[in-house]
């Protein structure tokens, strides 16, 4: 099983290019199921989760191939779907596999999708997906570990979810594009990835208003078509934030290319609070560490507030910062599993319920640590980059789920890091 070996203490310098957003790519790949024409997506990252999604789609009968000439492009042809079932063997490793449910049901009137897996960071139920589809007229039962759904044609409805749910909003948004009549999604998630999905669907002929707000209106149409040009997936704001934290922690000076500062307001505000110098352009961010950072208090919440997917990386930064800081997690329970591993590197962290109190220290010391989920693995890499001596990060398959060639990009800006067996 692959590991990362990191020799810490080297500041990061130079330029790095940000990949396409994982959390936009996954629903947009699934959106191909809505369209009986070949669809091309550009800026598709090379991630394990993308590979898993493509396996699910191919099982359903989608022809999906990366371009040999433009390897960031993926062509998907869902003209001839051969099955409406996404089996446990494919779905178990990734929660986002549930995103085939809405498109299959909307276009074909039936779907059988295994209950999903993914990161072990707490309960992330799919009941809001089911509730919303039932409001649109679907008949759904959960049996033998599968969601079995049927509908003659989905009907437009006003749907208010009990909580803000990103994948729930995406599933219902895709399903509503082919429904009969108007659907209104209340309490919708506002993430940039949802706006990007909506822009793709609009390019396919969907009628959507209000994306990026808590109320999205969708007027169903009879049929969607492929856009005239490939849809460009937005940059990954979480990869961007992760590299920003790594540079701030190591004392470096790096320019991030092909990214968007306007998707990162809360993260950039906290980095400035930590006394990190930032310059932003239309598609770039320059980050310079002005000495040892200051610890910052943060509280995770739904977009546009501070993202839960950046909590672990900022905790790693706080570990070597001046002062004591509080990190409050409000989105997922059990998302402090990286704490014990950071403590192995010498960090001073105490957890009380949903709050972690971090006492910053001058230096960490290298050790062997174990990744427990996707973003926790990124925090351990950041900690390893600043620790004295060697740090080995085990179980980095978590990292590969959501970061495109992370160690290669880090080496390109000066990190001493290598993948080993």
Curated annotation (Swiss-Prot):
Any Pfam family matching the protein: EPSP_synthase
Subcellular location: Cytoplasm
Pathway listed: Cell wall biogenesis; peptidoglycan biosynthesis
Enzyme category, top tier: transferase
Stored Gene3D superfamilies: Enolpyruvate transferase domain (3.65.10.10)
Alphabetical list of InterPro entries matching this protein: Enolpyruvate_Tfrase_dom, Enolpyruvate_Tfrase_sf, MurA_subfamily, RNA3'P_cycl/enolpyr_Trfase_a/b, UDP_GlcNAc_COvinyl_MurA
GO biological process: cell division; cell wall organization; peptidoglycan biosynthetic process; regulation of cell shape; UDP-N-acetylgalactosamine biosynthetic process
Residue(s) carrying 2-(S-cysteinyl)pyruvic acid O-phosphothioketal: 119
Residues bound to UDP-N-acetyl-alpha-D-glucosamine: 95, 124-128, 309, 331
Biological function: Cell wall formation. Adds enolpyruvyl to UDP-N-acetylglucosamine.
NCBIfam families: murA, PRK09369.1
Protein family membership: Belongs to the EPSP synthase family. MurA subfamily.
Protein name: UDP-N-acetylglucosamine 1-carboxyvinyltransferase
